[in-house]
């Protein structure tokens, strides 16, 4: 085989390989961005569902939305998020009404939100010692019929 032909074929093969690798890396980046976007959508739905279970604004529909949102997290959330979620759900469970405390609720909510924020890559990294999330109620009067 002629040397110049071999060099041309090697150049062609190298160019094709570079194009394939570039395409593959680009596709992987797109897929990861789509996964991140979907994960954020589920996390937002979970945070929004907290509104339906906050004392003073809680409704049966809110509890159903919370249940659905937390169950959806089982699809993709890392184990640290699921462990924090399970601890939080146990604390707020109706079967734990006698032992429930605001302090434990707040601490478990903070742990859960810290795990979620870490999973989505919130920067700068939160300071665990000072992270104190507070859920707000609407304060709107409820229509009682």
Model-based region annotation:
Residues 1-12:
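Feature marks short, highly hydrophobic, charge-poor N-terminal signal-anchor/signal peptide-like helices
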């Amino acid at each position: 085989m002629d040397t110049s032909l071999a060099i041309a074929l090697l150049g062609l093969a190298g160019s094709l390989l570079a194009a394939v690798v570039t395409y593959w890396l680009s596709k992987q980046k797109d897929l990861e961005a789509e996964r991140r976007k979907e994960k954020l959508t589920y996390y937002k739905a979970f945070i929004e569902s907290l509104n339906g279970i906050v004392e003073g604004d809680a409704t049966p529909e809110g509890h159903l939305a919370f249940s659905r949102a937390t169950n959806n997290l089982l699809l993709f959330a890392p184990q640290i998020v699921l462990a924090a979620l399970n601890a939080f759900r146990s604390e707020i469970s109706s079967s734990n009404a006698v032992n429930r405390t605001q302090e434990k609720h707040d601490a478990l909510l903070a742990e859960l939100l810290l795990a979620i924020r870490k999973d989505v890559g919130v920067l700068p990294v939160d300071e665990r010692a000072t992270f104190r999330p507070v859920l707000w109620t609407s304060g709107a009067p409820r229509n009682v019929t």
